[in-house]
Structure formats: C-alpha cells, structure tokens
C-alpha cells in the first residue's frame, strides 16, 4: 500500500485482512511523522493531519484488537529520545492528553467521569490554555534544580538540564525542603520573538524555523547550551511530576496559585467551571481571542480540579482519564488546485489566484487562494493539478504553504505560464523597479481596473454605499447603466429617463430595492475628506495615509489645489509630504502621478461638484476622545456600525476591533458578544448606545 485515501474508509465494512494492511501502513507513516516532529523538529504534516491518521489507527485497532502491536500508536506517547542526549527515566510517566474535537466529545468526557465516579453532577473542572510548545519536566531536590528533561516517549526523555537553566526566569532554587519536587510545563517562543529569530537566521544564512513550536523545540534541544542561551525561550508550568510532599496542593486551582507564589511562570488565564456550558463558553472565548495572544495555543485543556478524584480516575496507557484537550479546528488543510486565474486590481496589479477543490478550514469553506505573483509560483513550483497545503490564521486570506510533491502526477500537473499582457485589456504588463507584481498601465480604459475602482469607491471604508455590491456593479457596467464613478450619482436621474429596462423592472431588483439604493447613494454624497481621498484609489494611499493627507490639506479645495501644484513639480509641497511620518516618498510620488493624468483631475472636479465633502475636523488633543481607543460590540438601534465609527473618529478616537489592556472604552449595543465579558474582566469602562449618543451630542 503506497497511498491511503482515508475518505473512502468505512471501518464497519473492513475485513481483518484489509484492516491489517491499513494499520501496517499507518504504523510506518506515523513513525515517520513522529521522527520528523519530535526528533528532527521539522514536521512533515500538520497537527490536524496527524490527528486524523492517529484517530483512524485507534478506531481500527479498537475494532480489531488482535492487530495491536508492541509499538502500536494507539498505545504510544511521543517518540524515542535522540541518542545525542543522555536519557532520563521519568519517575512518573509523562502522558499525553486525549483529544476532543467537538462539543459532543467534551460532553462524553464528562459523562465518562460521572459514570466512573458514580456521581450525577459535573465535578469542578479547571479550564486552561493548551500551550503549543515543547513539554518538559524539571526536578528539584531539597529545593535545588538538579535535572530537566523532555517528554520523549512518555517513559524516557532527553536530558536538557543545562539548556533549561539558560532561561533566565526559570527558578534555579525553591524555598522548599522536599526531597523530590517535580514541575511540568511547556517551553515556547512568543510570536514576535519567533519573527525576530527567523530574521536573524536569514541574515546568518541558516535555515528558517517553520513555526514557533519548532523554534522552541530546536532551541531547547541544542547540544551547546550557549546557543540555547541566545534564544528567547519562555515557559509556563501547569502540573506536578513526582513529589514526596503529597499535601503541597489538593486541587489544580490551588496548585496553579502555589506555583505562581514560588515564582514560576504560570498562565493566569484559567477558570474554574462546574458545567458543560461554561466550559464551552471558555473555549469559544479563547478561540475568539486566540490570534491576539502573544504565543501560540492549539486548544484548551479541561482537568478535574480535585486531586483526590484525579487519583481515583487514574489513566489509560497513554492518557489520564481526568483531563482532555479540546483542540481548535485545523488552520491548515490539503486540497487540489483545479486552475489558476488572473485577477486585475484597482491599481492595475495582476495577481494569480489558485482555484481549489473547496475545503473547510477552521469553519470556513475555502475555494480560492492568492498566489501573489509570478515569482511565488515559480519558487514554490506550484502547478495546476497539484495538491497543496493551505494555511489560514484568523480572518487572514488563506495562503498556500507548499506543494505535496509526493502526490504530484507528472502527466496531469500543468505549469502555469504567466502572460505578458493584461487578461482584461491585452495591454503589455510591466514590473516596476523595486516591485515583484506585474501591472497593467492602462488604468483609464482597462475594464477590470474600472470595475475594481468603482467597487473600492463605494466600499465600506470609502463612501459606504449600502446595496451596491460587486454583483450589482458588474450588472450596471455590463448593461451600460454606468461607465464610471460619476455615473453612480447620476443613476437615479438617468433611470427616470429610460423608456424601457428601468432598474425596477429588472429581475432581482424591484421598486423597493431600487428606491433604497437611490436613497443610500444620495446619503453617501455627504462625505468626510479623508474618506473621499481614500475612495480615489490612489496607489499607496490607504485609510491611514488618507487621514494624514486630510489632516495636512484640511479642505477638499486645498487638497486638489496643492496636489495640482505637486503634479506641476512644486518642490516645497513634495518635500513637505515626504517629511510627514506615515506618508513618505512613495505616497508623494503616487499622488503626483495621479494628478498628472488629466482624466483623473476631470473625475475629481466632477465629484467635487456633486458631493458635499466635509472639511477635516481634527483639533489635536482638545477633542473629547483624543488618543483614546474605543471598541464597539453588538448591534445599534439608532446608528449603523459605519456611522458610529465615523462619530468616534471625529472625536479623535482610534477605533479598535478587539478588547485588550489598551482599550479605553467599550460601547455595547444589543446582543453584545465576548468583548463585553473581556472588558468586564479587565475593568474597562463600558457604556451603552444611549450614553454614547449623549456623549456625541454634547
């Protein structure tokens, strides 16, 4: 058996012979992956992919017990320690946790505990983060650190004593006199330190680490402790190993507090629960805030709080019965590229996009992924027909990490030939100096660029015309209702003049929908200066740059007058823009080029005659909410989310998306989410919609 398609396996229909072939195949695959993960610090598959294979192995062995081998992965923890390190026998086995992947799994975990203990209630459960690092055990004898080791295979680990001592915050001595006192935890590297470390590796011409977990593992397992000392390692402790004082703590909650008192680093984001609802609520809250953490986590851990109950529950050969890890959905998946198309952006950038067999990653179905540019395709040797690994973090656009070369079919995979001309208007593509992206320079006549600029102009952060989405814009352009941005504001009047094919008569539109659209267009005619500047889609002018330009020019008239002087090579204006922090040479150059095109100037002149562009209203630190960060949550009855954001910005505030220690104020509407709970925990000031409106009006 060379390959295995697990989607076709029905365990209930397996014969013993077929099951044996699959288990034999899985044994070899899992052993290979264990070697790469635990010993080489260079995983070949994602955690999620590994979990799928291991769970399949466990289920088959459960149905066919005679297939269980001495080294069967249903009874295995970790990987055999490397011969490069001296071996350490764990006085108390370092077991791995059983995994749960859905609410039902966690519910079953509680039910099994109740049945085992013969109780009819949920015992108290401590809910903690599952840190994605390298597990370790540290032994103290009479208060002195004498030995530290990795998990290894759960029975025998690797001696990392001298390496662990290089972590500055790790206690070398403890104010206790116990003969043996072992703590267990996780060694990790923060996301920011990981990025810095990889930059250093690149400068030194060394291999880059694939993720923070591998960086931490590779750093603590250095043969030379001096190298480990140069790495920004951190740790959390969360459990005991072997101890001679069995009365140190009676519960997990008490243990975490006492470990903290001993000056160990303990993650303080844990809660005590006694029901499934609050356990799942903890998981959901953590999942929401996951991408805002300084370090990587891959789930949460639930542990029975009472150590006496933990002792009664005991463990299987691989995992304790009193704990379970509720893993986050996979952020990495594998799927097939069916085609590669080209997408032309509002500034002419031509981006290759991979069309994929749809795959669900972290609850989101993904069918497209950007390939960025020609160099990206060539450097990763990405071809049509390839199976690729996708990565998605939070709401970030999915990225193709690499190709599964073992699955490549040479006969069916096809190299993508990047064209020399624009797929929309056939003009020659150019790659500007200092860039890697190919661009179409036919900005005024390229249909794709016209379409994208209109979409940008009406978008949420620009003029925010509700009801005018991409599909409707495509319809209006294709059917000649509009040909440019100005036509949007003439749409209502022009529609009245039509003798046939009025918008309200078109299927999918309707009189109510059309009237609402016209109302929204008219409301959008009143716009603040920075949003107007942003809406123009000048290259290198984003939302922040637009605010800086609005702050500099104050009025629409001055913005246009000064920009025209800039286009006419007035050095004073150019130098002034170049010296504004956050703008610089690139923005000044692009604004100059934009106003050198007469068609752009004509467009702006027409828009100024149609729109009411409000002057910049920033008044420095005298504004009510100057230098404050405000977050909004829930739905609001009297104002839209976009309008309330504008209100905040007019008062000098910075609008955030997540609640953190840097948040000054949370404004809550109906059906407020997890942000409210987080703000309450952090002691952040909270007001409702009515109080907000009163504040704004004052």
Swiss-Prot record:
Ligand binding (NAD(+)): 47-51, 96-97, 128, 151, 186, 303, 327
Domain of life assignment: Bacteria
Residues forming the catalytic site: 130 (n6-amp-lysine intermediate)
Keyword Membrane: no
Recorded catalytic activity of this chain's protein: NAD(+) + (deoxyribonucleotide)n-3'-hydroxyl + 5'-phospho-(deoxyribonucleotide)m = (deoxyribonucleotide)n+m + AMP + beta-nicotinamide D-nucleotide
Gene3D superfamilies: 5' to 3' exonuclease, C-terminal subdomain, 6.20.10.30, BRCT domain, DNA ligase/mRNA capping enzyme, Helix hairpin bin, Nucleic acid-binding proteins
HAMAP family reported in the protein's UniProt record: DNA_ligase_A
Protein name: DNA ligase
Species whose genome carries this gene: Orientia tsutsugamushi (strain Boryong) (Rickettsia tsutsugamushi)
Lineage of the organism: Bacteria, Pseudomonadati, Pseudomonadota, Alphaproteobacteria, Rickettsiales
Gene responsible for this protein: ligA
């Amino acid at each position: 058996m060379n390959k295995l398609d697990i989607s076709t396996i029905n365990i209930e229909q397996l014969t013993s012979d077929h099951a044996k072939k699959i288990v034999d195949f899985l044994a070899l695959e899992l052993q290979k992956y264990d070697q790469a993960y635990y010993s080489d610090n260079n995983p070949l598959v994602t955690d999620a992919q590994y979990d799928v294979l291991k769970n399949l192995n466990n289920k088959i062995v459960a149905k066919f017990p005679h297939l269980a081998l001495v080294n069967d992965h249903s009874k295995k923890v970790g990987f055999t320690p490397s011969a490069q390190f001296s071996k350490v026998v764990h006085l108390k086995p370092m077991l791995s946790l059983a995994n749960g992947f859905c609410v039902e799994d966690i519910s079953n975990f509680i039910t099994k505990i109740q049945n085992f203990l013969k109780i009819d209630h949920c015992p108290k459960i401590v809910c903690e983060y599952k840190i994605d690092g390298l597990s370790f055990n540290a032994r103290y004898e009479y208060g002195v650190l004498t030995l530290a080791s990795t998990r290894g295979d759960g029975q025998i680990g690797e001696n990392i004593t001298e390496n662990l001592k290089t972590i500055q915050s790790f206690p070398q001595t403890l104010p206790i006199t116990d003969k043996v006192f072992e703590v267990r935890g996780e060694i990790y590297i923060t996301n920011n330190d990981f990025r810095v470390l990889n930059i250093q590796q690149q400068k030194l011409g060394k291999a880059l680490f694939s993720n923070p977990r591998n960086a931490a593992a590779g750093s603590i397992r250095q043969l030379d402790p001096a190298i480990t000392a140069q790495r920004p390692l951190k740790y959390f402790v969360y459990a005991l190993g072997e101890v001679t004082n069995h009365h140190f703590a009676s519960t997990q909650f008490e243990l975490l507090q006492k470990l903290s008192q001993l000056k160990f680093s303990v993650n303080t984001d844990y809660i005590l629960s006694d029901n499934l609802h609050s356990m799942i609520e903890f998981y959901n809250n953590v999942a929401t805030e996951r991408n805002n953490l300084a370090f990587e986590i891959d789930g949460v851990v639930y542990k029975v709080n009472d150590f006496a109950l933990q002792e009664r529950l005991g463990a299987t050969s691989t995992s304790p019965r009193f704990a379970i890890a509720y893993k986050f959905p996979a952020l990495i998946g594998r799927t097939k590229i069916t085609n590669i198309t080209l997408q032309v952006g509002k500034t002419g950038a031509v981006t290759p996009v991979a069309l994929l067999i749809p795959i669900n990653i972290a609850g989101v179905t993904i069918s497209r992924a950007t390939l960025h540019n020609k160099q990206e395709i060539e450097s990763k040797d990405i071809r049509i027909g390839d199976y690729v690994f996708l990565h998605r973090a939070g709401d970030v656009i999915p990225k193709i990490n690499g190709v599964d070369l073992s699955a490549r079919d040479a006969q069916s995979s096809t190299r993508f030939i990047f064209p020399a001309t624009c797929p929309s208007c056939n003009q020659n593509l150019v790659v500007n100096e200092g860039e890697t992206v190919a661009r179409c320079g036919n900005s005024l006549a390229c249909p794709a660029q016209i379409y994208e600029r209109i979409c940008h102009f009406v978008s949420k952060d620009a003029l925010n015309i509700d009801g005018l989405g991409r599909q409707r814009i495509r319809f209006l352009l294709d059917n000649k209702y509009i040909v440019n941005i100005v036509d949007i504001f003439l749409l209502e009047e022009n529609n009245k003049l039509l003798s046939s094919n009025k918008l309200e008569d078109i299927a999918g539109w309707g009189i109510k929908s059309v009237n609402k659209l016209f109302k929204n267009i008219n409301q959008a005619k009143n716009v603040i200066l920075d949003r107007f500047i942003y809406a123009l889609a000048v290259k290198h002018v984003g939302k922040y740059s637009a605010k800086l330009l609005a702050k500099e020019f104050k009025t629409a008239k001055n913005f246009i007058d000064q920009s025209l002087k800039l286009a006419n090579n007035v050095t004073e204006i150019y130098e002034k823009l170049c010296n504004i922090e956050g703008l610089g040479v690139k923005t000044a150059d692009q604004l100059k080029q934009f106003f050198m095109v007469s068609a752009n100037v004509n467009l702006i002149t027409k828009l100024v005659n149609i729109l009411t562009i409000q002057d910049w209203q920033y008044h420095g630190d005298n504004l009510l909410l100057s230098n404050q960060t405000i977050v909004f949550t829930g739905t609001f009855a009297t104002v839209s989310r976009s309008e309330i954001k504008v209100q905040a910005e007019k008062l000098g505030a910075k609008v955030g998306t997540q609640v953190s220690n840097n948040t000054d104020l949370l404004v809550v509407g109906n059906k407020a989410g997890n942000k409210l709970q987080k703000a309450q925990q952090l002691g952040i000031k909270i007001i409702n919609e009515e109080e907000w409106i009163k504040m704004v009006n004052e």
